[in-house]
Amino acid sequence: MTRNHPALRKATSNADLYSDPSPPRPLRHSSSVVLGRAHTTASLPYMQRPDRAGPGRAWRVREGTSDLSNRHSVAASYPDLMQAYDDYPPPARQQNPPPVPPKIPEVPAEQPEKEAEAPRPVSSHCWIPVPALAKEDPASYTKPFTDYMTNNPTIFHAVDAVAKDLEKNGYKKLSERDAWELKAGGKYYVERNGTALIAFAVGDKYASGNGAAIVAGHIDALTAKLKPIPTLRTKAGYVQLGVAPYAGALSDTWWDRDLGIGGRVLVKENGKIVTKLVKLDWPIAKIPTLAPHFGAAANGPFNKETQMVPIIGLDNSDLGASSSENVEEFKASVLGGEGAFASTQPQRLVKAISKELGITDYSTIVNWELELFDTQPARTGGLDKEFIFAGRIDDKLCSWAAVQALLNSSSTLSSSSQIRMVALFDDEEVGSLLRQGARGNFLPSIIERIAEEFAPSGKTSSALSRTYANSFLVSSDVIHAVNPNFLNAYLENHSPRLNMGPAVSADPNAHMTTDAVSTAILQRCVDRDVGVRKMDPKLQVFQIRNDSRSGGTVGPMLSAATGIRAIDCGIPQLSMHSIRATTGSLDPGLGVFTFQSFLENFESVDQEFK
């Protein structure tokens, strides 16, 4: 530091030093900060060195050393300043109380530390107060989650967005068709059918037979899918679209909603079949209700095949009005004529999708899988923005939180001797029976290939068995949050609340994997990080009443197929299976914290249970 340094330009009197400190300036994110005014003047009074200062209150500065491991570190040597400090003669008698160091506010950190760093050994030149690192706030995950929900309305978009996020963070895509070359410290992911994904990170100290910490859930959601040939005859001037409900879709909550269309389109390009994602995110379809004036007919029950058919346009050509559709002309324009896929689809829909994807030759469209979705974006709500209102929360919520937790845990991978894994399955809402579902071989095959890659020659079978035995699975599916209008539907003391943390789901009839041991393991993992963040997630408990039926999760089928210990734990939400549901605005972040604590702490916690 030179004499012209801004910190030395203004001399400070003793009266200034012992007066109330002025409001400090915010620290800059750099390798050095401007020292407090009371400690950086050209004429320094004698100050007794507070050798008994408590840890965290002040650190001494090593002359000529810069603390590069801390974003808020103090600058290096100031020989002139230090010499002035040491040479200043002490007064005969202390007349005033010792100066009060200026209060330095917390500075938000980009990547908060998990544990407080111990004071470093330094010279005795002076003491400088060091600010505490800002703690991670669950609210920081609210907007990223709502953006993800709005931008990825179909399962194809959701999985694709996860894959892109993984690649941005150093994960390498593997193909099940190819041979793998895995290494300790590596990060990888595998897709199946474009609707299921497994990502895993190998600890730097991983050895064959070691366990895996796994968070598994499903990324599919209730929707209405277009039928293979969705073209319908015009009724009373309305153009309608043939759709079929996926799981419990087309319920009463689907009436009068603004519905867009999206999914994946297979296109022939340069002799190859490529997949393109499409999203028509403006209101296209509507399922209109019958006005209550018509009496009993408006009250239902309703036939999903004949009375819940979306309208997508008008065609009054039967009354002499001009029509934008000429079926024969359209078929003739498609190369291949009636045999081409596009000729079997609503022509205005074909044109809209082709325009969105830049397709000029309709005959290059080989096939597609499209579905309806609510176009209303995910939003925060409530007087203090305590809620998130969105579609498809079940279960994009736990899936997204699990992936973020895996990405966050990369910073501690170098000290791990285990596998950290997130598995997102399709078809959970309809029984998980397909190859991309949890009843398929997707998860076992990935773990088997990892075991084979690291196992010594001839020891593959033993390594796989030990891997399963040393692993633990958190089956993460959303949980019913308590509804204040229907309290009698919930079991007392087993009713999770929003913005408190995930809930452990129990069921005495084996619909869930939770037991006393698995609950204790997860609780210990969460307890390890108490106080690290701005808000600690609280593990809540859910169980249905004896007079209610339970849903299911991927947990029991995965645990039974592999022998892996497991627990069911998910994030609470209201209005499950509605087209528009609710969760807490802090719940995505609290879910991330819970899953991250499990991924990072299971290895050490498991030692307590051996």
Task: Describe each model-derived feature in a short phrase.
Residues 2-4, 10-11, 16, 20-93, ...:
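N-terminal hydrophobic/helix-forming segments and targeting peptides
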